[in-house]
Amino acid sequence: PRFYRRLRIPVSVHLPLAKWETRFDPQSTLKQDFHVTPETVVQVPMMKREDEYDYLLDRRLSCRVVGLPYQGNATALFILPSEGRMHKAEAGLDQETLTKWFKKFTKRKLQLYLPKFSIEGSYQLEKILPKLGIRDLFTSHADLGGLTNHSNIQVSEMVHKAVVEVDESGTQAAAATGMVLGFRSARMGAQVVVFNRPFLMAIVNPEGVLFLGKVARPAEGHF
């Protein structure tokens, strides 16, 4: 049998500054409760914008999905599982699901409430990338000629570190306000969608997934 040397690759990614196609008004950002758990509530700066968004309700995964385009060709997907269904949504999030969502999106007028947050974390890509259709990298079929001169190298572990900051303008942090927000009644025809409990976020472009993470506690930036 042929023996392969194992290679551990650290990958650090700080996503470049990206602006929303339509920014949030900072004057509409106010403090609001975020339910980390049914028993734990923290105050977070909550952005608000009423507009038409790409939207769908995935009944199979028990979640709502809202798409916010950046300037250029990238889109942020915010995924809000029904209460108690986070694990179900996480388990079903793969390349096939993302592709299906983009095909099934419809334009819907929403009054969207989304917390500002900054998250940083590390996770094992060898567990995530196969779900997104990338498998050969962790087998003997991978072409690693650009990384090493050895021919008998196989990736056993890839550690990904990502930083994402989301605010009114896009992926850039800003100071929070000290006021308290009360949800206003939406205008006629607008549906209210409030991200006030743990949710998932993906940033995608035509080439693939740039970022995938879970926002569990915006005030403290936890994955």
Locations of the language-model features?
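Secretory/exported precursors with cleavable N-terminal leaders
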Residues: P1-F223
